[in-house]
């Protein structure tokens, strides 16, 4: 599939179980992000597209948008954590984050939501939690199990 180009970042879209798609891009574009949001969680990140869109939006809200490509302000004190149950997806998201202007505020982990929740301190809070969750119940299964895991509700998060 190659590279999907956004306004100020690119998403490599080769190994993730769930590729960049219209649903995810629309979700990222329509999310209400507040300038006060500092700790965000993306559940089921896939390629990391929605987390990257949130990082770009926060950068625009908190800092003055830069007109020169590649010269992007980075808001301080912001952390966006992205988790995915698929190892290849979490790895690809990590690479996409590393190659973005906001690498210092983005991180990805290969972990389930239940396992991740168990690692959090009781006082840990997120200002914003978002997800483009699996939404098929009994639809036609794909030949690749990883794709089914990212598309069907039976596998959980």
For every predicted segment, state its role.
Residues 119-128:
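A short acidic, Gly/Pro-enriched loop at the edge of an enzyme's catalytic core
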Residues 93-94:
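Conserved SAM-binding loop
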Residues 79-84:
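Conserved SAM-binding motif I beta-strand of class I
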Residues 48, 52:
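Glycine-rich SAM-binding Motif I of class I
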Residues 1-35:
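Class I SAM-dependent transferase core
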């Amino acid at each position: 599939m190659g590279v999907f180009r956004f306004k100020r970042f690119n998403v490599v879209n080769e190994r993730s179980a769930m590729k960049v798609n219209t649903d995810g891009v629309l979700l990222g574009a329509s999310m209400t992000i507040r300038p006060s949001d500092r700790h965000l969680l993306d559940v089921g990140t896939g390629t990391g597209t929605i987390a990257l869109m949130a990082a770009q939006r926060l950068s625009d809200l908190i800092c003055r948008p830069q007109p020169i490509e590649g010269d992007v302000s980075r808001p301080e004190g912001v952390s966006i954590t992205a988790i995915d149950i698929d190892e290849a997806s979490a790895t690809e998201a990590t690479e996409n984050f590393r190659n973005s202007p906001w690498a210092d505020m983005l991180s990805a982990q290969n972990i389930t939501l239940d396992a991740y929740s168990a690692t959090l301190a009781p006082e840990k809070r997120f200002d914003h939690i978002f997800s483009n969750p699996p939404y098929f119940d009994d639809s036609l299964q794909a030949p690749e199990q990883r794709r089914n895991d990212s598309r069907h509700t039976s596998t959980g998060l």
